[in-house]
C-alpha cells in the first residue's frame, strides 16, 4: 500500500544533498468516463407534485423485485396487486413503504393554531416504538404487521413482502426481500498500484487553525512537496482526487443576515466569500498537479436539494485555468481505469440515520445497495428535484467503489452480492474534525486512511505539560 511504498526510500530524507534531484512522473489515467449525466438537471420545473417520483420509482423497481421474489420464494409464488388480495390467501406483494412516525417533524403540525404546540427540539433519531409501516402500490395501501423490522426500514423503500391479509385488514408479513445488488461489470486487471484520494468536509471558513494546517499538509503530500523520495514516489501514484462535499464550514451559512436591516449589512460581505477564495487557492495547487473532481455538499454554494448541481466555475478564477479541475454533481459516478466509483456527500446516509435504527454508516451504505436505491427517503425527509420520467437514484449498475462523505469516522469493508458482485464501501470522514482522508487502491480495491492530525495532538501534549502557549 501507500505507506509501504514510502518506507522503501525513507533513508533519503536525512541523506546529503545530491547534484541531481529525483523526479517522479504522475501515474497516468488510462481511461476516465464521467457517468453523472442522469444527475444533471436540464429543464428545472418545480410545478409538479412529488407523487410522480414515487410512481416512477415503483414502476422501475417492480421487475427487479418480481424476479428477486421468484428466486427467493420459488418461481410458483403468486405476485399480486393490493386490489387483488383475498383474506387468508398467501401471496407476494410489491410496493413502496410509508413509515408513519409520531416523532417526525411536521411544519403543519407546528404552525397549527388548533394544537398550539411548542416546536419540537431537534433529535439525533426520530424512531419510536409506535412507528407503523404502510405498503402502497399504484391503487391502494395496507398496514403491515408481523416479521418485519419496523425501526430499520424507512419511507420510500420499494420491497416485496410475502404473507396474507388477516381479518383485521392488515397484511401479516411472513418474509420480505429487496431487489439486492444490481449487475456489475468485471474489474480489469491493473499491473501497478494506482490510488484515488477521497477527501470530504474541508470546512474552510470555520476558523480552525489545525484544520487549515492539515489541509495544506494534505495538498503538499499529494503534489509531492512534502516528505522524502519514497513519499514523493508514492504520491506520484495518486491518479485522481475526489473532494466529497462540505468544502465550506457550516459557520459560513450567515442566515441571520436575511433578517437584519439593510443598512446593517450593506457594507459587509458574506462569510463564505473568503472561504471560497481559500478553496480556489487550494484547488489551484491540486489541479496543477493531479486531476481533481469537486462535489458540492450541504454547506456549499449550490442548490440544496438532491441532486446537487456542480459549483459554478466563476467562483474559482484561478483553478479553472486548469483542465484537470472538474466540477461535478452530488451524487457523482465515474469510471476510473475500469473501476466504477459512485458516491455522495453524505446527506442521504445522514437522513437514513435519523429515521432508522441503523447506527453504522457502512451498514447504511450496504443497505442502500441492497434496496438498490441511493436515497429512498427523498423526497419525504430529504429534499430532491421532482423527477417524473425516471428516478435517477435507482442503481442501474453496481459500482465497484461506493462511498459517502462527511462521516464521523473512517470505515471500509467489502461486501458480496448474489451474483458474486464485490463492492468496496468507504465512509470518508469529515476532514475538518478528524484530519483524515482515504486512499483507494484501484489494484485490488483496498482502502486505507491517511491522517494529518499528529501536529494537533503534540500541541495538546505540550499544553498539558505547561509548555504550550
From Swiss-Prot:
Q: Which InterPro entries match?
A: DNA_pol_a/d/e_bsu, DNA_pol_D_N, DNA_pol_delta/II_ssu, PolD2_C
Keywords for this entry?
A: Acetylation, DNA damage, DNA excision, DNA repair, DNA replication, Nucleus, Phosphoprotein
Q: Which residues form a coiled coil?
A: none
Q: Name one GO molecular function term.
A: DNA binding
Subunit structure of this entry? Answer: Component of both the DNA polymerase delta and DNA polymerase zeta complexes. Component of the tetrameric DNA polymerase delta complex (Pol-delta4), which consists of POLD1/p125, POLD2/p50, POLD3/p66/p68 and POLD4/p12, with POLD1 bearing DNA polymerase and 3' to 5' proofreading exonuclease activities. Within Pol-delta4, directly interacts with POLD1, POLD3 and POLD4. Following stress caused by DNA damaging agents or by replication stress, POLD4 is degraded and Pol-delta4 is converted into a trimeric form of the complex (Pol-delta3), which consists of POLD1, POLD2 and POLD3.
What does the sequence similarity comment in the record state about its family?
Belongs to the DNA polymerase delta/II small subunit family.
Its recorded name reads DNA polymerase delta subunit 2
